[in-house]
Amino acid sequence: RGLGDVYKRQGVEAVRTRIGVEATGKPFDAINVSDKSLVPEHFNPMVNAGAILLCTMLKGDSYSERFARLLELIRQLADNPEIDVDEAVFRSERETGFKNRALAYLLKAHGLFKDAVEDVLECYFRACSIRVCSRDLAYIGMALANHGRKFKTEERFFPAEYARFVNAVLMICGMYDG
């Protein structure tokens, strides 16, 4: 969801310097990394480490603004202004997200982002808690399949090149456990 927006704003190559596209073959929340595996190309946006890094790249002066932009994009893609955060899920993520917190501190310790970890995680946990229905997902998928254009109106959200790249990442990296 946010990947297309980040590509649109920064370009594919700029994003690829910070977030990779390699399938990990590991669980989505894996922390078992070594110093030589702590490089951006190993953190695709379909696993927690890559998604956390993606949150640092969203546009906005604050993380609340960054999240608001992401949520608005999802609402537009899904043609559903009612999409919102499931607050119970968000609170649970924030209160029990110890592995994600450890992972974020590890990423920061290795210089992969400079922002305050808790600000980044607030955005990440909120993004993980967005409640959508199957229709919403279908509309978002249609925008990607329709080369970055909205399903009903053909309004362009991002260039076809970015939609192709997001689709490729979904196909290659979306099956993270094998």
Task: Tell where the protein language model's regions lie, with residue ranges.
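Active-site-proximal alpha-helical segments within enzyme catalytic domains
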Residues: 131-150
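Generic alpha-helical structural context detector
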Residues: 56, 105, 139-142, 168-171
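Short, small-residue-biased leader/transition segments that mark boundaries at the very start
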Residues: 2-7
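Active-site-adjacent helix/loop patches that line small-molecule binding or acyl-intermediate pockets
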Residues: 8-127
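Conserved SxxK-family serine transpeptidase/carboxypeptidase catalytic domain
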Residues: 151-178
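Catalytic-loop motifs flanking and including active-site residues across diverse enzymes
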Residues: 1, 46-53, 133-137, 162, ...
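Short, conserved, surface-exposed binding loops centered on an aromatic residue
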Residues: 129-132, 158
